[in-house]
Amino acid sequence: MNHKLPQHIAVVMDGNGRWAESRGLPRVEGHKAGLDSVKKIINCCLEKKISCLSLFAFSSENWSRPVTEVNFLMELFLEALRKEIDDLNQHGIRLKFTGDREPLSQVLQKQMSDAEALTKNNQQLILNVVVNYGGKWDIVTAARKLIRTVLDGKLAYDEINEAVFAQFLDTKGMPEPDLFIRTSGELRISNFFLWQLAYTELYFTDVHWPDFNEHEFELALISFSKRARRFGQISQSE
């Protein structure tokens, strides 16, 4: 493709359960199938030299799902991390994890920290896995940290601006997404990156995540290439 490409893509991988149910399978089978799509999209990003891919793996609201499904998701996440980390590292992928880790198991937390440490110097792609995250949580937590910094005398009140505030978010140091993709026909962002998506181009598709392949990814990129990103300004034609 010769058209412009996004440098940071954020994805809500929706529809695993619906994909499975439509085939008469348990919902957990959809989550397993969804891992194949993750691998495909990671490879696409590497081929197209996209800098950052954020995957919304588990939201803070997902704890309300059946306990058996939540437990399966956590085990699947841990198993996938253990199995794929060496391959990700060999391909120059840097792993980052965004979200509140405290409620996660100690075993999973350690695996996440070890993966970050192992891949910290890799530069081919930042793979940001978003786990136990909510946009409102991120903003409130950032506000608390900011207030504490001001009270400690490390920052003056009149020094606070958008750039300063962003440094207190859990995504600090990462570029804001250029393209947001959500699968499975849901037309909302569901408390994901509320601050970070301010000027992001949104792309929605009816395709369930396990069916989101290289072709579907290409369609999203083509759609992005046709957008005129104005960042609140008017276009030259206007």
UniProtKB/Swiss-Prot annotation:
Binding positions (substrate): 15-19, 27, 31, 59-61, 63, 65, 182, 188-190
InterPro entries, sorted: UPP_synth-like, UPP_synth-like_CS, UPP_synth-like_sf
Annotated disulfide bonds: none
Enzyme Commission number(s) of this protein: 2.5.1.31
Organism expressing this protein natively: Legionella pneumophila (strain Lens)
A GO cellular component entry from the record: cytosol
Record field: catalytic activity: 8 isopentenyl diphosphate + (2E,6E)-farnesyl diphosphate = di-trans,octa-cis-undecaprenyl diphosphate + 8 diphosphate
Cofactor notes: Binds 2 magnesium ions per subunit.
Cofactor section: Mg(2+)
Family affiliation: Belongs to the UPP synthase family.
Residues annotated to bind Mg(2+): 14, 201
Biological processes per GO annotation: cell wall organization; peptidoglycan biosynthetic process; polyprenol biosynthetic process; regulation of cell shape
Top-tier EC class: transferase
Domain of life (superkingdom): Bacteria
Gene3D superfamilies named among the record's database cross-references: Decaprenyl diphosphate synthase-like (3.40.1180.10)
UniProt keyword terms in alphabetical order: Cell shape, Cell wall biogenesis/degradation, Magnesium, Metal-binding, Peptidoglycan synthesis, Transferase
Quaternary state and interactors: Homodimer.
PROSITE patterns associated with the record: UPP_SYNTHASE (PS01066)
UniProt-annotated catalytic positions: 14, 62
Role this protein plays: Catalyzes the sequential condensation of isopentenyl diphosphate (IPP) with (2E,6E)-farnesyl diphosphate (E,E-FPP) to yield (2Z,6Z,10Z,14Z,18Z,22Z,26Z,30Z,34E,38E)-undecaprenyl diphosphate (di-trans,octa-cis-UPP). UPP is the precursor of glycosyl carrier lipid in the biosynthesis of bacterial cell wall polysaccharide components such as peptidoglycan and lipopolysaccharide.
Protein name: Ditrans,polycis-undecaprenyl-diphosphate synthase ((2E,6E)-farnesyl-diphosphate specific)
A GO molecular-function descriptor: ditrans,polycis-undecaprenyl-diphosphate synthase [(2E,6E)-farnesyl-diphosphate specific] activity
